[in-house]
C-alpha cells in the first residue's frame, strides 16, 4: 500500500477533526435521534450502490428535466374537472386538491372538502408538503428535517397541503388501487418526495398509485378537545387520510381504478398510519387490504397526556384556555416555534402524534388486542432484521451495546 500524498493526509486530518467534533457533541434527545436516523436512511437510499436503492433513484429519472407536457384527457371529479399529463405509458396527475386549505377557522379541525370548481384545473405539479418539524414554513424539505431530496418542482412547506398525486396506465378499466402513506413519523415527510414517485409501481404492476400529503406534527395532532376546542383536533392529520380514502371511493373509477379494490400501505411512520386507520371507524369500508412495512407497534398517546401537551403549547404562546380562538390568527411560524420548545410533546416517534380521543380514534390500534372493526381486513406485515437499531445512531453508547443491554431495556 502506498503512503498517502499531501492531499490524502489533509483529507484524513479533516475526517479526524470532524470525528472529534462529533464525539464532543452532547447526547441527542429521542426526537433528535429519530430525525438524525431518518436523515441517514434517506442519505443511504440516495448514495448506496446496491440494486434496490438504484431502483428507488430510477423512479425519479423521468422528472430530471423540464418537459413540454402532453396533456391527458380532462377527468371529471366530484370537486371539479382536472387535467394531468402523459409520461410514456402513464397518465399522471399531481397536486390534486382533496381538501380545503386548513387555515384560519379550519386550523386544528377535521378537514373539509374543497369548494367545487368549474374551470379545468391543471394537475401537473406537486402540491405543497405539510409544515413539519425542523423545516421553516415555506422552505423545501430537501436537506432539511429529513434529508429527503425534494422532487423537482416541489414547493416549500405550507399549511395549505391537502393534495394527492395519481399515476395510472389508463382512465378506463378497473385496476387495483394502492394508496401510499409516507414515512417520517407523524412529524415529517411528504407524499411528493422524490423517492416516493409512484410511476414505476403503476408501470410494473398496472395499478393506480396514489400518494398523499396530510397535516403533520402540531398542525395535525394538537388535541384541544378537553380544552374547549374541536373534539377531534388531535386526529386532524389522520382524518385528512380518511378524506383521501373517501376521495378515492368517489373518484378513482374515473382514473381507471377499482374503488372496491383499495390497498393502504406505508413504511415506518406510514406503517404506523396504516395501523391507526385500522382502529378508526371513519376509515371502515374505505380500504380492503393493508400492508405495514416496518411500522412501529407503538400505542397512541393517552388523552390526558395529549391535553398536557396542548396546555404546554398554549403557555408557550402566552395564551389561556379561553383564548383558543386566537390560535386562528397566529402565524404558522409562531405555532411551530412554540411546539419545538415543548419537550413533553415529543411522542415515541418524535413530535406530536395521534391520541385516543374517543371519537375519531376510540381505542388503541394494538392494546389490549386488535380492533374488531378491522377483523376482516387482510394485513401483510414486513420487518427487517435489527431495523430498530436505526434509532440508536447518535446514542452515546452506539456501537457498544451488548445483547444483555438491549434485552434489559426491552
Locations of regions flagged by a protein language model:
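Substrate-access "cap/lid" subdomains that shape
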Residues: 250, 284, 289, 293-409
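Alpha/beta-hydrolase fold nucleophile elbow
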Residues: 256-267
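Short, intrinsically disordered low-complexity segments enriched in Ser/Thr with adjacent Pro
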Residues: 9, 18-23, 44-47
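Alpha/beta-hydrolase active-site loop
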Residues: 231-253
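Non-catalytic accessory segments of hydrolases
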Residues: 55-235
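Short glycine-enriched nucleophile-adjacent loop
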Residues: 271-283
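Catalytic nucleophile serine of serine hydrolases
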Residues: 266-269, 281, 294
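Active-site loop->helix "elbow" adjoining a glycine-rich segment at hydrolase catalytic centers
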Residues: 183, 236-240, 268-271
